[in-house]
Structures are given as structure tokens and as C-alpha cells.
Design a protein with these regions (language model features):
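Glycoside hydrolase catalytic-domain groove-lining segments
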Residues: 22-25, 29-65, 69-72, 76-152, ...
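A structural signal for short, well-ordered beta-strand segments and their strand-loop junctions
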Residues: 10-14, 60-63, 181
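A charged, solvent-exposed segment within the mature domains of Sec-exported extracytoplasmic proteins
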Residues: 1, 17-19, 23-26
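Substrate-binding cleft of secreted/luminal carbohydrate-active enzymes
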Residues: 8, 89-100, 115-217, 222
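An active-site-proximal structural segment forming one wall of the substrate-binding cleft
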Residues: 1-16, 77, 81-88
């Protein structure tokens, strides 16, 4: 709330979730898991935060795992209920990094190698589940996109500006118009942002399509 008095009109929270690094048996939670679920606790925190900030006309946004959009197991484990959090947050920022999806999610052999299809599928799922809310309850969606390579993913190719731009186009094609880029080294490719029209350059489209086909063929032949 103090940030509002310093001139900020939106506060974005990250890590509003339970840990994925330790087992529940290794943690002493100060609540009865038999009467309260992780999702209930996180949702209540989001509601409380949004109400506090809303009282001072501050927009409240929250980062969430991209997989919680339509994966009930992940949602339950980290406590992020995409729809319920969306009822209170002004904006949700799902981290729909293609590298963070397992093989065959959205029927993609290696989602990392299909940046357009992976992001489009995730955000179409976002549209579908959030449409269960009334128009007044529905949050804005501003997705996090991948501007980095993922060498830890088996069979993953090195990301190029075309891969980044393909994800941006997927945002527009899914019906959204806001996005964020992430790279832990804080190095972003300006060439990936060269189109100001929201249209993907035909040369980049061809690059991405050729690469996706080549990567799919390579995976199939390895099998």
C-alpha cells in the first residue's frame, strides 16, 4: 500500500504459492490441511491483498504457474487456483514458457520446440476456464513468455528471435493483447520486437514452421 503513495498504480506479486522444492511432510504448516486446502489459503491471501490495494486504487496482479491453468494436480500442489485467483486479481500473469511443459502436453512432442502452438494452447485454455466467470469478475491476462533457451530440456533447440516472436503472435491469436518477456540474465533480443503491428513477419513465420517440423522429425527418428 505504501507503494501507492510513491506513485505506483499497480503492484505485481510473484511466488504466491506453496513450495515445489520440499515435500509437505518436511514442512510444518500452521494450518489444518484437513479443513483448509492450499488453494483456499492462497485464494484468501489474493482476496485480502486485492481488497487492501483496491481501497487505495492500486491494481493488483499476480504471477502464476502456466500449468495450473488446466492441470489440477499442479494447481493443488502449489495452491494456485487459476479461476478463483482471477476473481480477485485485476491481472493474472501465467508463466506459459514452452520449456516448462512436459512431453506430449497439448499433444506436442517437445513443447519447447513448438513455441507458437504451446503458448496458443495454454492461452486458449486460459480463455476457456476464465469464461466461466462473469464479465465483471474476469481478470486481465498478461502472460509471461520465454526469451531464453532451455538446454536442460532433452531435444530442445536454441531459441531465436523468431521463437520469441512466435509466442507473442500466439498471445494475439488467443485473443489477448498484453505480454511480458522473461530471461534470467536480463538479456532480451530487440529483433524479436521489431513488428509494431502485432503481425508476425512472414520470414519469421517460415523460420518457426521449418524449425518445428525439423524438430518433430528429429524426435520421431530418434524413437
Amino acid at each position: 500500500v505504501r507503494a501507492a503513495f510513491d506513485g505506483f498504480d499497480e503492484i505485481q506479486f510473484d511466488y504466491i504459492r506453496f513450495s515445489t522444492e520440499v515435500k509437505d511432510s518436511e514442512v510444518n504448516y500452521e494450518f489444518d490441511s484437513k479443513t483448509l486446502s492450499k488453494r483456499q489459503i492462497i485464494t484468501e491471501f489474493v482476496k485480502y491483498s486485492a481488497e487492501r490495494m483496491g481501497a487505495h486504487n492500486i491494481e493488483f496482479s499476480a504471477d502464476v504457474f502456466g500449468t495450473v491453468i488446466d492441470n489440477d494436480v499442479d494447481s493443488r500442489d502449489v495452491g494456485q487456483d487459476y479461476v478463483q485467483m482471477g476473481k480477485y486479481a485485476n491481472t493474472l500473469s501465467p508463466m506459459v514458457y514452452p520449456s516448462h511443459y512436459n512431453k506430449m502436453v497439448y499433444r506436442l512432442d517437445i513443447p519447447n520446440n513448438h513455441p507458437y502452438k504451446a503458448v496458443l494452447s495454454a492461452l486458449k485454455a486460459s480463455k476457456r476456464v476464465l469464461d466461466t466467470l462473469s464479465v465483471s469478475e474476469r481478470p486481465n491476462v498478461r502472460a509471461w513468455l520465454q526469451d531464453f533457451s532451455a538446454p536442460w530440456v532433452a531435444g530442445a533447440h536454441k531459441y531465436t528471435p523468431a521463437d520469441v516472436r512466435a509466442q507473442i503472435q500466439a498471445v494475439y491469436d488467443a485473443g489477448y493483447d498484453e505480454w511480458l518477456l522473461w530471461n534470467a540474465s536480463i538479456r532480451y533480443r530487440e529483433s524479436a520486437l521489431k513488428s509494431a503491428t502485432g503481425k508476425l513477419d512472414s520470414s519469421l513465420v517460415n523460420q518457426v514452421e521449418k524449425k518445428e517440423k525439423a524438430d518433430s522429425f528429429a524426435v520421431k527418428t530418434e524413437k
